[in-house]
């Protein structure tokens, strides 16, 4: 699901040397780098590549770009540029075994600069005979940036729910048709243009978080070009995960962390959080956030608490932080809010820093353009009065399913507000890239879910796997969101590629 900026997408923890697949695996087309970069219109004409002079962590990388239509059904709408970089396989003496194309998620996150070196490092054991193709989705990174003034202020992360939703809606108004032009199907189409231009027969898809949504879309639309897929921190294109499913995963994760660290008791921690949430719902407090030497005071209520606690279990595991949630809730039982204020303050400062990272790393407008256009509505059927329909749906939820928080606080928390797009202009093309049960390629698919992930839980991974006829689901112990960043997860990924 949406994870604003992944702390790391792939890790180099996989130090175990794994042999590559057998020599009689299907060959991909041998690529020959050119001497000059070029930007070419969308077509099957060969693309040219040149050494990337500004990627020191990827010294062999070759860069290029392609110009594609903003709207393929309306040539007069103009064009946009999509950037890519290819890291050639290290062993050029043998036939290639494929091309891995990863996406780190977001939406809105850069692939080339932000996570390219991490993918290259983590996948190194299988990149001797596989190329690595890094593509910045349209609107992000080195591709033509998508921006909107309404979301330019990173301190919007400190704003209340209504102010955030209003700003997101204003961004949609400012983008107009450009929102639909940066949808997941548009991103997948550009990816296939690059594949064709480089003469690659098939792609080995690798998605983290939103990348699993993108790669499922590519596979559905281009089945004959899909060789395999790895989906890490996965979710289905037709289901939402931030509601009761995520709350159940949070309860499980807190219990597991306490059991495994032996530094807290799961049921007690959940009871303490529930008591604190009840208190802050009735009597909000305040918390100070330090930003660039200045102090901002913001409300500390149940909604803010749900955002901070949910985020602690929606990224790569941090045992100190996660045990700290239980410790802070316990202290609050005795009237000491200092630890919980520290937890929330750090969470909010991180949210602001993420929003301030800049379009080269994280394009907030591209994030919301995809999220509001492609993700299913939480409570559809409102017609012209989506907000009223949403409120009716929210009111009908059972708080018990969202413990230790209320249904409202959990369902609208921070970056995972299920009503974030209520003010976004509705587009006729809005909706999931494909429907449940749509035909998918019968290729090997590995789905990894972390047992400590409250963002894209194990159940969401099973739903993602069910989209494909031949998918294996692996629950990775002690892994959080995007298990590819865990040692156990990356080892499974390398084994998957080595077996092909």
Task: Enumerate the predicted regions with their spans.
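C-terminal motif of bacterial Sec signal peptides marking the signal peptidase cleavage site
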Residues: 18-21
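Alpha/beta-hydrolase-fold serine-hydrolase catalytic core, especially in secreted/extracellular enzymes
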Residues: 332, 349-354, 498-500
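Bacterial signal peptide processing site
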Residues: 23-25
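Long, low-complexity segments enriched in small/aliphatic residues
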Residues: 338-375, 379-380, 389-395
């Amino acid at each position: 699901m949406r994870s604003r900026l992944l702390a790391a997408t792939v890790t180099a923890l996989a130090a175990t040397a794994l042999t590559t697949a057998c020599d009689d695996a299907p060959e991909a087309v041998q690529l020959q780098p050119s001497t000059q970069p070029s930007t070419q219109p969308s077509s099957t004409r060969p693309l040219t590549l040149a050494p990337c002079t500004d990627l020191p962590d990827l010294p062999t990388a070759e860069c290029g770009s392609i110009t594609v239509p903003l709207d393929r059904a309306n040539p007069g709408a103009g064009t946009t540029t999509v950037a890519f970089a290819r890291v050639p396989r290290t062993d050029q003496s043998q036939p290639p075994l494929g091309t891995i194309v990863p996406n780190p998620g977001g939406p809105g996150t850069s692939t080339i600069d932000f996570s390219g070196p991490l993918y290259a490092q983590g996948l190194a054991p299988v990149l001797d005979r596989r190329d690595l193709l890094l593509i910045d989705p349209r609107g992000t990174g080195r591709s033509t940036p998508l921006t909107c003034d309404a979301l330019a202020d990173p301190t919007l992360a400190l704003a209340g729910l209504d102010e955030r939703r209003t700003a997101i809606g204003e961004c949609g108004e400012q983008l107009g048709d450009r929102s639909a032009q940066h949808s997941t199907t548009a991103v997948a189409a550009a990816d296939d243009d690059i594949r064709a231009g480089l003469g690659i027969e098939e792609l080995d898809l690798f998605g983290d978080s939103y990348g699993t949504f993108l790669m499922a879309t590519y596979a559905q639309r281009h089945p004959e070009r899909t060789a395999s897929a790895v989906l890490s921190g996965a979710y289905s294109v037709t289901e939402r995960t931030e509601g009761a499913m995520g709350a159940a995963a949070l309860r499980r994760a807190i219990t597991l962390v306490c059991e495994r660290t032996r530094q807290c008791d799961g049921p007690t921690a959940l009871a303490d959080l529930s008591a604190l949430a009840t208190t802050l719902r009735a009597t909000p407090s305040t918390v100070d956030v330090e930003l660039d030497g200045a102090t901002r005071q913001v409300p500390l209520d149940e909604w803010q608490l749900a955002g901070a606690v949910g985020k602690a279990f929606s990224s790569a595991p941090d045992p100190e932080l996660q045990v700290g949630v239980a410790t802070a809730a316990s202290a609050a039982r005795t009237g000491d809010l200092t630890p919980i204020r520290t937890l929330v303050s750090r969470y909010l400062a991180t949210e602001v820093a993420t929003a301030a990272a800049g379009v080269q790393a994280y394009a907030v407008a591209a994030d919301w353009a995809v999220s509001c256009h492609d993700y299913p509505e939480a409570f559809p059927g409102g017609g012209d009065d989506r907000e009223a329909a949403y409120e009716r749906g929210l009111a009908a939820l059972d708080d018990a399913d969202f413990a230790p928080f209320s249904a409202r606080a959990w369902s609208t928390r921070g970056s995972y507000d299920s009503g974030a797009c209520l003010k976004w202009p509705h587009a006729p093309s809005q909706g999931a890239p494909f429907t449940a049960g749509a035909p998918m390629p019968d290729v090997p698919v590995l789905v990894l879910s972390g047992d400590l992930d409250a963002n894209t839980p194990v159940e969401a991974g099973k739903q993602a796997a069910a989209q494909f006829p031949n998918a294996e689901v692996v629950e990775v112990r002690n892994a959080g969101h995007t298990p590819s960043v865990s040692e156990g997860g990356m080892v499974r990924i390398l084994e998957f590629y080595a077996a092909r």
